[in-house]
Amino acid sequence: MQYAKISGTGSYLPANRVSNDDLAQKVDTSDEWITARTGIKFRHIAAENEKTSDLAAEAARRALDAAGLNGNEIDLIIVATATPDMQFPSTATIVQQKLGITNGCPAFDVQAVCAGFMYALTTANAYIKSGMAKNALVIGAETFSRIVDWNDRTTCVLFGDGAGAVVLSASDTPGIIHSKLKADGNYLKLLNVPGQIACGKVSGSPYISMDGPGVFKFAVKMLSKIADDVIEEAGYTAAQIDWIVPHQANRRIIESTAKHLGLSMDKVVLTVQDHGNTSAASIPLALDTGIRSGQIKRGQNLLLEGIGGGFAWGAVLLQY
């Protein structure tokens, strides 16, 4: 049986780091308030000339280097993003060009907001298991700073920019063991950006609209449920999970999932304090951090999970 195994990871955060104290100079908030409710201390903001594709390409270069591959050995590129460079073409094709990949491999975007990397990773896994790809470049990249209302203290404190990337390679030994994706459009009003461009006009707000308490309750419930489902369907138990690598949105949501599974926070890769909610980038950012720090080791079992507007959510159980 052929598996899709992680052969390299990479991540990138823009140089401009904004602290809670910095934000307190602009809106009515404080370091204590933000930290107590979210666990966030800093977020990184892309430079004016940095696009989502720039962040994605830099994370991809680092992942390719870690995998020991050159760009033209990649035969699939998937970018998960809710903040693309353009209406079209896909950010994935722009990244392909920036990486100098000329082999004509398929490249496309997926959009499931904060669950985007789960959707992209699951899609790449299917390509590899079917024999349609041998080396897939899977990227989560966002510039959420451009869809945040910096006068709205309830949302501007939460989000940041960044990118994370994974190279998935065909392997005879286990990599991705099981994954599950879910969505329910009945909850779209809890979290969205309602604005749109049509007929040469912008209609609706271009900024994030969020029902914070509603999002919190839904996320806690669904992340616990899908974690249970993926572990059980794979024939595993929670005790066999070495690391949870969750979407980095809110420390309290992450703590709730760990508690539900009966796992200590010592088994959670936690990076939300350093970069805030980077949407589709947050899981691969945390994964790369865990691997490069030496926390995550080869052969260990990882549970990746995320949830985002839509609502869309997903989880992946894999052996690193």
UniProtKB/Swiss-Prot annotation:
Record remark: domains: The last Arg residue of the ACP-binding site is essential for the weak association between ACP/AcpP and FabH.
Main location: cytoplasm
Active site: 114, 247, 277
EC number from the UniProt entry: 2.3.1.180
Gene3D superfamilies hit by this protein: 3.40.47.10
Biological function: Catalyzes the condensation reaction of fatty acid synthesis by the addition to an acyl acceptor of two carbons from malonyl-ACP. Catalyzes the first condensation reaction which initiates fatty acid synthesis and may therefore play a role in governing the total rate of fatty acid production. Possesses both acetoacetyl-ACP synthase and acetyl transacylase activities. Its substrate specificity determines the biosynthesis of branched-chain and/or straight-chain of fatty acids.
Listed name of the protein: Beta-ketoacyl-[acyl-carrier-protein] synthase III
Organism whose genome encodes this protein: Neisseria meningitidis serogroup A / serotype 4A (strain DSM 15465 / Z2491)
Gene Ontology terms: biological process: fatty acid biosynthetic process
Keyword Lipid biosynthesis recorded: yes
Region span, ACP-binding: 248-252
Family: Belongs to the thiolase-like superfamily. FabH family.
InterPro entries xref list: ACP_syn_III_C (IPR013747), ACP_syn_III_N (IPR013751), FabH (IPR004655), Thiolase-like (IPR016039)
Catalyzed reaction equations: malonyl-[ACP] + acetyl-CoA + H(+) = 3-oxobutanoyl-[ACP] + CO2 + CoA
Subunit structure, as described in the record: Homodimer.
GO MF annotation terms: 3-oxoacyl-[acyl-carrier-protein] synthase activity; beta-ketoacyl-acyl-carrier-protein synthase III activity
UniProt enzyme class: transferase
Keywords: Acyltransferase, Cytoplasm, Fatty acid biosynthesis, Fatty acid metabolism, Lipid biosynthesis, Lipid metabolism, Multifunctional enzyme, Transferase
Protein's cellular compartments: Cytoplasm
GO cellular component terms, semicolon-separated: cytoplasm
